[in-house]
C-alpha cells in the first residue's frame, strides 16, 4: 500500500535543506556507492556524502519530522529508521527498475536492519524539473509519483521501482528505509485502517458534543433535559465503540509486533 505524506517539511525547512544541497561546497559522491550489486548498473545520480559537515543536522531535521508526523508513525510503525540519503538527479540521470536491498547495514550501529518500507521525500517542486518521476510497480500496475516539495511517499520495499530520466532541471530528494515493528504489509495496513477509524470516531464524538451543547443553549428547560439525556446515551455508545476499536488495535499490535 502506498501512503502519501503531505507537508512533512515546511517552507523554511525546505529552504534550509535546498540551500545546502545547491551550495558549491556540498560534498557529492557517485550514487552507485550506496547501491546494491544488482542495482549499481541501474543507478545514475549524485548523493550527499554522510561525511559532509552539514549532513547530520539535515538528517536530524528529516528524522524528527518523520517521527512527529502522525500519518508516517501510524502507517510505518517504525522500529528503526535508516539515516537518510540526499540525492540529486541532473540532466540525463535516472535510476532504472530495481528493488531495494532486503538488508542494509545501519551506518551508526553497524547492525543489519531489514527494509520493510521505503520513503522518498521530494525537496523541490515538479515545475523545477522535467522527468524524474518515481514509478512504483505493484500488483495493481505502475504508479507514477511526482509530488510537491515537502511531500513524501511511503511504500513497501518489496516493490520494483525506478526514477525516470531527468530531461531538464534538477531533481532533489531524500530517501530512507524503515524496519517496522510489524513485518507484514497487510498487517500494517489493517492496523493503520483501525487507527484512522479510531481517530475519526473520536473527532466525531467531539463534534457531536459541541453540536449538542449549541442545541441545548437554544432549547427550553424541558427540551434541554431530554436532549441532554439522549446526548449522554449516544455519547456512551460511541465511547464504547471507540474503546472496543482501540482494544482490537492494541491486541492485534501485541499479536503482530516484533519488539
Curated annotation (Swiss-Prot):
Looking at the Swiss-Prot or TrEMBL record, what is one Pfam family this protein matches?
Answer: 2OG-FeII_Oxy_3
Mind listing the UniProt keywords for this protein, alphabetically? Dioxygenase, Iron, Metal-binding, Oxidoreductase, Vitamin C
Cofactor(s) recorded for this entry are: Fe(2+); L-ascorbate
Gene3D superfamilies associated with the record: q2cbj1_9rhob like domain (2.60.120.620), Rabenosyn, Rab binding domain (4.10.860.20)
Co-factor binding details:
Binds 1 Fe(2+) ion per subunit.
**Swiss-Prot/TrEMBL GO biological process terms:** DNA damage response; intracellular iron ion homeostasis
Q: Give the GO molecular function terms.
A: 2-oxoglutarate-dependent dioxygenase activity; iron ion binding; L-ascorbic acid binding
PROSITE patterns, per database record: FE2OG_OXY
Q: Which domain of life is it from?
A: Bacteria
Query: Which SMART domains is this protein grouped with?
Result: P4Hc
Q: What is its EC number?
A: 1.14.11.-
Residue stretches making up the Fe2OG dioxygenase domain? 80-180
| Family annotation (InterPro entries) | Oxoglu/Fe-dep_dioxygenase_dom, PKHD_C, PKHD_hydroxylase, Pro_4_hyd_alph, Pro_4_hyd_alph_FE2OG_OXY
Write out the residues that bind 2-oxoglutarate. 171
Sequence positions that bind Fe cation:
98, 100, 161
Does this entry carry the keyword Oxidoreductase? yes
Q: What is this protein called?
A: PKHD-type hydroxylase PsycPRwf_1523
Q: Which organism is the protein's source?
A: Psychrobacter sp. (strain PRwf-1)
Amino acid at each position: 500500500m502506498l501512503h502519501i505524506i503531505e507537508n512533512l517539511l515546511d517552507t523554511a525547512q525546505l529552504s534550509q535543506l535546498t540551500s545546502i544541497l545547491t551550495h558549491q561546497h556540498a560534498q557529492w559522491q557517485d550514487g552507485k556507492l550506496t547501491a546494491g550489486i544488482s542495482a549499481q548498473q541501474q543507478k545514475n545520480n549524485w548523493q550527499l556524502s554522510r561525511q559532509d559537515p552539514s549532513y547530520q543536522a539535515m538528517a536530524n531535521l528529516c528524522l524528527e519530522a518523520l517521527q512527529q508526523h502522525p500519518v508516517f508513525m501510524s502507517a510505518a510503525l517504525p522500529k528503526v529508521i535508516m539515516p537518510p540519503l540526499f540525492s540529486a538527479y541532473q540532466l540525463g540521470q535516472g535510476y532504472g527498475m530495481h528493488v531495494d536491498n532486503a538488508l542494509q547495514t545501519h551506518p551508526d550501529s553497524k547492525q543489519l536492519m531489514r527494509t520493510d518500507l521505503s520513503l522518498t521525500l521530494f525537496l523541490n517542486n515538479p515545475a523545477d524539473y522535467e522527468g524524474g518521476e518515481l514509478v512504483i510497480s505493484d500488483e495493481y500496475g505502475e504508479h507514477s509519483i511526482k509530488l510537491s516539495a515537502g511531500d513524501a511517499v511511503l511504500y513497501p520495499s518489496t516493490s520494483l521501482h525506478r526514477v525516470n530520466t531527468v530531461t531538464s532541471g534538477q531533481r532533489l530528494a531524500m530517501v530512507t528505509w524503515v524496519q517496522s515493528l510489524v513485518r507484514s504489509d497487510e498487517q500494517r495496513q489493517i492496523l493503520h485502517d483501525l487507527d484512522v477509524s479510531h481517530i475519526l470516531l473520536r473527532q466525531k464524538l467531539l463534534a457531536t458534543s459541541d453540536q449538542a451543547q449549541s442545541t441545548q443553549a437554544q432549547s427550553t428547560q424541558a427540551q434541554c433535559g431530554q436532549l441532554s439525556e439522549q446526548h449522554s446515551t449516544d455519547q456512551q455508545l460511541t465511547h464504547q465503540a471507540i474503546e472496543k476499536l482501540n482494544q482490537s488495535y492494541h491486541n492485534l499490535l501485541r499479536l503482530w509486533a516484533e519488539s
